[in-house]
Amino acid sequence: MPVGTPPKGGPLGRSRSRLSASGLTTYLRCTRQWYLNRKVGISSPKTIGQVLGIVIEDALCNIMMNRPGPMESIEELREWAEELADEQAQSAWDIGLETWENSLWKRTDSDWSTVEVQDFKNKLSNGLELFFEEIQRCYDENGGPYLEQFRTGVEPYNIPTPKIGAKPHFPVPEKVRSLDARDWSKEHPFEWMEPDSPIQWNEAWEIARPWFKDPRVHQPQRMFHPEGWAAGELDLVLRWDGNIRLVDIKSGHSGGKFSESLQHQLRFYAWLWERTHDQSPVKNMEGWYLSSKERILYEAPSNEELTSMDEEFFSINNIMRTMGEGASILPAVAESETPDTTNACDGTSPGCGWCSLTQSNMETAGPMDDKLRKKMIEGNSISSPCVPLGEIPSRVNVSGNLIAQWGPLPNHFNEPVLGAMLQAGEATIAIEEAEPGAFLHLHDSQQTNVIIENALPGVWRDQPRLYVDQHSNIRVRQEDEPKGTRIGLLRTRANVEGVVVAIRQQNGVRLDGKPWSMLSFHLWDGEHIVEVVAFGSAISERLRSMRPGDRIRLIGAELGWRAGLIQLRIDVRKTRIEHQTPAFTTKSI
């Protein structure tokens, strides 16, 4: 099955604590690049290539969802498909334009008007040619082992290939309103032939069609490791001939600067497939390059290699989970052969940008435009009531009596986490896992006088909260030892100021179909950066109008945490944002 659900809970969407194929390849290229881009979450200006890659892949899958009527030859089938490619090329160009124009931060030296619809059409035609190689082989082999089963109307796969007129597969169907009452039927000319008759060209298209992400399904469609610490999202799965072949689609060509990452990416997918399937081993892996119409083949890992990858990937994930604490250093102290949370890389690996920035190369390194670079070279001064980002407390010890336990229940990211309640005198405070699986033995703690060590202080809905993770500990407190910080004295908000160095907005749909939106930007105070987020109604036009290089001050930002790093949140009622003027005049959002 190319789609599953997390075995131990947690989000179906991307998680900063799970190992993914793209995260792995980034980590292997440059450790600090992974840390800043993936864990800290700092972005760079959007490029046309990033938009193009997504819309082209979606357009190719939209074409393959179609179901042809009777065809006399492969040439007739190809002509039918090329007409669909013409329509999808224009549609993809239009979607790309809208995505580009709605991006808050994009390359100033790029213009969507330079993108040609014909370029989209060429890539789609090349992708179809690679698919037609499968169709031809399917026809030559008389439909493969599943022809007669298909003709009976019974899918040979647990999760069918997405196609027009067929019911889609939702990973969590109980979250979809009125799923069984929906009518997914749609007119199409396809019909199966009688049993034992020769295969027809439209049947070869129907059988050879790979699995891909169904565009009608708003829920994430991923595989999840049985222990929950790795996940992957496949592009295509070819399986018509009884063998499993995993395919990754690339819009460029095999000589691109990121091409070396393809093998690592496919090895990860093959490993994850093997660890999520008792049967149906991977036969091989392929990369389809749409610019050059290339099919690059790779052998599937052996059993010995898969066992070695278990240890390798688990070790990498553990390193990722423990990297960084609190606010993150930027620029780096110096360049190092082993870049990490404090040391920079040499900037030569594909994708390197922020990770190569040091105190000595501010004038040349990094992805900044002229405005942002000038502001960062000027530096940043901090005045009362604001404090440096590096001085925001990240760990506290708090004692009291555990009086209640609950969960797992959704947190503010809609992730299922465990919770409990701590009482000290008249004061009470909620305790919660910092993220799913971060403190699995929370409910094993004795409901007595305890001390919680290395907890992360924060606030949610105006109520103080303690977050616990793998660095935290709960134990019985001895009578003669210090009680730690009093609940009423916990610091749950922060006043900070600095320069906006990155910004982006993300929109999506929850498992139940309800929309969500989040705007995030990164604030730099001259030495450190932190992520600042606003959700839903807290996203104002004033926030959306901010751009990298703007100087701002946040008063009363909520203190939160994401994967052990500070994440400040904007409370629409109590957080004030001040944009810099000569006198730093207050302007509330």
What label would you give each PLM region?
Residues A59-K213:
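A non-catalytic, helix-rich entry segment at domain boundaries
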Residues W184-L266, I429, S540-R544:
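Non-catalytic protein-protein interaction segments used by genome-maintenance enzymes to assemble
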Residues P393, I403-E435, I503-G536:
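OB-fold (S1/OB) nucleic-acid-binding surfaces
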Residues P7-G9, P198-N202, E206, F212-H218, ...:
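Metal-dependent nuclease catalytic regions and adjoining charged, substrate-binding loops involved
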Residues G255-Y289, V450-E453, P457, I552, ...:
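Metal-dependent nuclease catalytic cores in nucleic-acid-processing enzymes
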Residues S360-P410, R461-D512, E541, S545-R547, ...:
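OB-fold nucleic-acid-binding modules
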